């Protein structure tokens, strides 16, 4: 279609004075773009994308997600999901950010009625930030105490009954002594402890008791509240937010430089840990346990759902960082190459992290003389702060060194992820209120992030983390990603979008991308979301169900995030009247005058290009129907003809 609403000289008449408003918004956008900072070079952008996409999701979440969902067989649905959902969504978000030079909210000038998608994603991002920072606090805590002459979780305290030390050999001796005194045939292995019989309490390792009793001071009943913040974790949380602020305070000028370290250092540590891990006794069994496929799990829909969730969590799609990072690129930057590098590297890092972690856990099972490695693996937070420390404490040579390396690596990975998420929020605010100084917004939002994080460093904090992650992070991000894709491909139109890509990248869009964006990606996401909603079960923490009030609060959290989409759409139609309200709604589904490249000269060239494309299609329609459909097919397939 001809772009009457985005002519460089004047906008379309919207009635009730909205033409002047649109012109003012357009002028503000062009002024902002002229002042918008770009990456120092393309490598800074690539390193930043790696630092957010290759993070805790690869080392912490992927290993236990894989082993819980078929082991090596999980790699098959994960790779399929990566190619049909992960890569297409990642590339699409890169394109949207770079094409418009705008953040997560402002890009919706393409379909103004969908602006609520951007605000909803911002809400989901804030939820993720709130608990992600508490994981950094835990990581910092373990990092600091790792400098002691003896790892504090490797030995029992006097007040801990039924505790066995996590020291090398002594742990095994104590454990085997406990076994010999009990009815071995009645053993019920659970985690890294077990129940000897009905009258014997569960033996627990010192690493588990240290985490539960010393670090988080776990509270198993939150009906009377979550308790007060722990001062040590509060201090660690404060330090984490100071580091985050220092990295983002100057925008991409500072975060771009930090990205080199944030992206590359974890690989150095990961390779060091890998070399050490594969040389440990029992490592081979752990690796085989991780990679051995359970083919029956491929027919389990839950496995496919978990593959999608892991893909979103790992690549950070649907929450805004990729759009935000790409918005600071030059218009002609080669993002196709970067998208392929990051998504491929993300998968390889997940495999590398899984092999490393399960090699360590294999050694733990060997030391405990436990045949089933499943019995030493904990999911969630316990994997990073119980199973890993327990395994490291059994290293014969300088376990303190490997503990420092491991937790510093986790901290760097977490910083890389949260810097991107926090920068997304700062960019949204600065795009909306152009007179604000970036560093001031970064300071205020960092202070707010610290205050929100306090609830997670209380004795009941892990309950809140589980609740917010489930309702406010996973499901909000997922449903809004569906709306994001639908708005661009189905409402704005696949052909329009592909024309924009061709103009920006100077290359036709291949059949693979067209098929994924128009069919495979949205259909798979919709089916998986419906299945997830239909089979959803009450969430639990530490095998305990949440109180009914907590579940209600969780659903309210989800409703607030998802409701941003329709509410902001109705608001836009109300504030941009086009006669009747129905006409206003229809108009909100068409690109506004602000849509397109932000640079005025590039914008003029784009308008000419789009109008030429519209003229070509108008000419094609006047030919025979057979020829018309043939040309439509070749256009869809990305032919250059």
Curated annotation (Swiss-Prot):
Its main location: membrane. Residues 1-38 are cytoplasmic. CDD domains: SLC6sbd (cd10324). Residues 1-34 are annotated as: Disordered. It holds the Pfam family SNF. Keywords: Amino-acid transport, Glycoprotein, Ion transport, Membrane, Sodium, Sodium transport, Symport, Transmembrane, Transmembrane helix, Transport. It is found in: Membrane. This is Sodium-dependent nutrient amino acid transporter 1. The gene is NAAT1.
């Amino acid at each position: 279609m001809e772009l009457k609403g985005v002519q460089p000289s004047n906008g379309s008449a919207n009635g009730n004075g909205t033409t002047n408003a649109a012109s003012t918004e357009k002028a503000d956008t062009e002024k902002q773009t002229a002042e918008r900072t770009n990456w120092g070079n393309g490598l800074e952008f690539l390193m930043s994308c790696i630092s957010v996409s290759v993070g805790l999701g690869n080392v912490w979440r992927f290993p236990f997600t894989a082993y819980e969902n078929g082991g090596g067989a999980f790699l098959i649905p994960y790779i399929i999901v990566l190619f049909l959902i992960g890569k297409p969504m990642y590339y699409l978000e890169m394109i949207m950010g770079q094409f418009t030079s705008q953040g997560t909210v402002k890009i919706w000038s393409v379909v103004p009625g969908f602006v609520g998608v951007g605000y909803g994603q911002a809400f989901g991002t804030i939820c993720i930030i709130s608990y992600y920072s508490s994981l950094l606090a835990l990581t910092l805590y373990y990092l600091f105490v790792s400098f002691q002459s003896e790892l504090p979780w490797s030995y029992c305290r006097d007040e801990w009954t039924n505790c066995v030390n996590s020291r090398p050999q002594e742990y095994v001796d104590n454990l085997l002594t406990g076994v010999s005194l009990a009815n071995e045939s009645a053993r019920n292995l659970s985690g890294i402890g077990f129940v000897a019989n009905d009258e014997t309490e569960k033996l627990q390792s010192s690493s588990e008791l240290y985490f539960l009793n010393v670090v988080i001071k776990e509270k198993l009943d939150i009906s009377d509240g979550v308790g007060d913040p722990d001062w040590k974790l509060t201090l660690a949380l404060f330090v984490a937010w100071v580091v985050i602020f220092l990295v983002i305070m100057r925008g991409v000028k500072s975060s771009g430089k930090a990205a080199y370290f944030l992206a590359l250092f974890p690989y150095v540590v990961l390779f060091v840990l890998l070399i050490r891990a594969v040389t440990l006794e029992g490592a081979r069994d752990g690796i085989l346990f991780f990679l051995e496929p359970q083919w029956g799990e491929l027919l389990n829909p839950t496995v496919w759902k978990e593959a999608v969730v892991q893909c979103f969590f790992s690549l950070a799609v649907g929450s805004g960082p990729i759009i935000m990072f790409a918005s600071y690129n030059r218009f002609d930057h080669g993002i196709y190459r970067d998208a392929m590098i990051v998504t491929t590297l993300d998968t390889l890092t997940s495999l590398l992290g899984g092999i490393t972690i399960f090699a360590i856990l294999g050694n733990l099972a060997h030391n405990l003389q436990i045949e089933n490695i499943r019995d030493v693996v904990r999911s969630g937070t316990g994997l990073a702060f119980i199973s890993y420390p327990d395994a490291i404490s059994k290293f014969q040579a300088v376990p303190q060194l490997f503990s420092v390396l491991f937790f510093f690596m986790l901290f760097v990975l977490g910083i890389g992820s949260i810097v991107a998420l926090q920068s997304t929020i700062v960019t949204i605010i600065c795009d909306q209120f152009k007179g604000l100084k970036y560093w001031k917004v970064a300071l205020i939002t960092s202070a707010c992030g610290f205050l929100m994080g306090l609830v997670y460093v209380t004795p009941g904090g892990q309950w809140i983390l589980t609740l917010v992650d489930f309702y406010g992070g996973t499901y909000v991000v997922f449903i809004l990603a569906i709306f994001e894709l639908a708005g661009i491909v189905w409402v704005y139109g696949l052909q329009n979008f592909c024309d924009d890509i061709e103009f920006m990248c100077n290359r036709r869009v291949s059949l693979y991308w067209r098929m994924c964006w128009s069919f495979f990606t949205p259909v798979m996401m919709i089916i998986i979301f419906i299945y997830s909603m239909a089979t959803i079960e009450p969430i639990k923490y530490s095998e305990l169900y949440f109180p009914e009030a907590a579940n209600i609060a969780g659903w309210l959290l989800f409703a607030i995030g998802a409701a941003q989409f329709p509410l902001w759409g109705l608001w836009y139609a109300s504030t941009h009247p086009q006669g009747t309200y129905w006409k206003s709604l229809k108009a909100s589904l068409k690109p506004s005058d602000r849509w397109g490249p932000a640079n005025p000269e590039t914008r003029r060239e784009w308008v000419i290009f789009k109008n030429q494309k519209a003229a070509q299609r108008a000419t094609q329609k006047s030919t025979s129907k057979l020829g018309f459909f043939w040309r439509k097919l070749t256009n869809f397939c990305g032919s250059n003809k």
